[in-house]
Amino acid sequence: MYKRQETDSIDRHIAFNLHLADSIGALSGGRYDVTVKPLVEAWGFAGRQAERHPDVDSILAFVGREKVRVEEGRLVKADPRVQLDFNSIAKGYTVDLLARLVESFGARNYIVDIGGEVRCKGVNRQGGPWRIGIETPFDGNMSDGEYVQKRIRLTDGGLATSGNYRRFYLDADGNKVAHTIDPRTGRSAVSRLLSVTVAAPTCAEADALGTMFLAMGADDALEAVRTMPDVKVYFILADGADGYEEYISPAMEAMIMQ
């Protein structure tokens, strides 16, 4: 986004997304940063062919939130090669905008779902809570609901799931390269944390938090969650060759359907 050094005035959507990204970034210890786009492109996850051996150190010179500032309503970048990537928020934010539109027509009970990013309110046709299936995160699972690990009750708010089991490839050495990039190292954030589901007041917030936890990796994400008593998360982690381990935060437990 924006390959010039200075932009025209940013609109309210960009301003909101940037503010939310900064809020999540402050929680992440440097693992969540929307200036990650040059790295995403180099690893082949932005519609470009992956570089065989990306020059990560050189690219990192153009990554870092401190390299972008807002000045008189415009984005100003330290270098024109700095680029912003709001993909970790945009789908959730779009869901929120659609939910707002639905409510403007007077709907009291609804669900908006774009590719697993969900915002809902009220109850379903049977008068019960909305039930959201969380996929089993085996590599290449494109079944769209055929393999469900858990179901979650939701009556009001947003829900988003992030995972590295769909968008990935194996490099020349057989190593898994997933689309979630750690902006500190410039490399794929692959760990035994396979899937992250977050419930939050808005889908945009849930979307961004899910990406943050995934980028942190299993150990750091679990440690972070334990310092956030109100966060609602469901983690699926690899356990051995084919097994799974689950972590459900105390605030999420009542939402899990057994």
Tell what function each PLM region has.
Residues K3-Q258:
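Mature catalytic core of soluble alpha/beta enzymes
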